[in-house]
């Protein structure tokens, strides 16, 4: 009986220990104690109840303690519950402390929650980053297109990381400055001879205002001549003028053809009126004979004159045709 009770008690103790070890990270608690970080088991149990991973809070806390940072469990747990990257923020604080950069934990946490890589920002403050722009094209006053590529050396401005514009804004502003500087050059050779003028002009405009960076230098890496935009525009304009002139000429030709057809129609109309009038002559002659306005003798004289006129016209027509067919001497 005694042995059975002992076995039951032993099983209960073992099960209780297994439950305890599975719910409370004893190994993590021992590691914290060994590192000099005093964390109560109750604190670890509370993290479990608040659905916080103890390792993601205690491990960065140990790292911060070893680096000499005075951080608390509540600070790290609050940042974790807010959705931040606790380990990244602690690494950024350690890097800032080593580089003698004033970066409180609250500011680092705010930068992290804003979606910025706070560790990269600290590293960029110590080691400036070089941003290379693509080829940016501008047209000088003489119509030649010039393409330039720039290297922008920037340093992160930690004070403006929250709410400040990013790299895309820096590239866009520098590109705008390059286009403006090339466009104000009277000749493209000025850009080729003095590319540093672009750097000086662009750098003097304070393009880093409102951004999360401080521009240290702008260097022109490459300058190329592209094409003669002015000549291309003149060619396109000449082609457009030619097409317009051709369209207007076609319009005038169509109007002339329409006018010609209209005149032919009017000629036919007049000819019809003449034929109609001629058809009324015999009737008028008959009426004149009946009324005695003309005599029969006058009528035959008129017919003789018409026949004589017709014969003369026929002779003249044959003469003209023979003259046209005779060879030239």
Curated annotation (Swiss-Prot):
The chain crosses the membrane at residues 6-26, 27-47. Keywords: Cell membrane, Membrane, Transmembrane, Transmembrane helix. The keyword Translocase does not apply. The keyword DNA-binding does not apply. It is a multi-pass membrane protein. InterPro entries: FloA. It is found in: Cell membrane; Membrane raft. Its main location: membrane. It comes from the Bacteria. One of its GO terms (cellular component) is membrane raft. Belongs to the flotillin-like FloA family. HAMAP family: FloA. Homooligomerizes. Found in functional membrane microdomains (FMM) that may be equivalent to eukaryotic membrane rafts. FMMs are highly dynamic and increase in number as cells age. Flotillins are thought to be important factors in membrane fluidity. This is Flotillin-like protein FloA. The gene is floA.
């Amino acid at each position: 009986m005694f042995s059975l009770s002992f076995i039951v008690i032993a099983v209960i103790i073992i099960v209780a220990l297994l439950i305890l070890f599975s719910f409370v990270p004893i190994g993590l608690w021992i590691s914290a104690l060994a590192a000099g970080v005093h964390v109560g088991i109750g604190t670890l149990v509370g993290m479990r109840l608040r659905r916080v991973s103890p390792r993601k809070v205690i491990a960065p806390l140990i790292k911060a303690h070893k680096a000499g940072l005075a951080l608390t469990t509540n600070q790290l747990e609050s940042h974790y519950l807010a959705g931040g990257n606790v380990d990244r923020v602690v690494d950024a604080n350690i890097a800032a402390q080593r580089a003698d950069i004033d970066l409180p934990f609250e500011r680092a946490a705010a930068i992290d929650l804003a979606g910025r890589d706070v560790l990269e920002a600290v590293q960029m403050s110590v080691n400036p980053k070089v941003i290379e722009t693509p080829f940016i094209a501008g047209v000088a006053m003489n119509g030649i297109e010039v393409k330039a590529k720039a290297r922008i050396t920037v340093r992160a401005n930690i004070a403006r990381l929250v709410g400040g514009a990013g790299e895309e804004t820096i590239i866009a502003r520098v590109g705008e400055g390059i286009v403006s500087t090339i466009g104000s050059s009277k000749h493209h050779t000025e850009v080729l001879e003095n590319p540093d003028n672009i750097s000086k002009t662009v750098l003097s405009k304070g393009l880093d205002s409102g951004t999360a960076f401080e521009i240290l230098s702008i260097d022109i890496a490459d300058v190329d001549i592209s094409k003669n935009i002015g000549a291309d525009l003149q060619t396109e304009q000449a082609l457009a003028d030619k097409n317009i002139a051709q369209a207007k000429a076609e319009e005038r030709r169509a109007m002339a053809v329409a006018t010609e057809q209209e005149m032919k129609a009017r000629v036919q109309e007049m000819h019809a009126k003449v034929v109609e009038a001629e058809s009324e002559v015999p009737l008028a002659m008959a009426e004149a004979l009946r009324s005695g306005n003309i005599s029969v003798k006058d009528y035959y004289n008129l017919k003789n004159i018409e026949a004589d006129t017709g014969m003369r016209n026929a002779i003249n027509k044959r003469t003209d045709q023979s003259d046209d067919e005779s060879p030239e001497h």
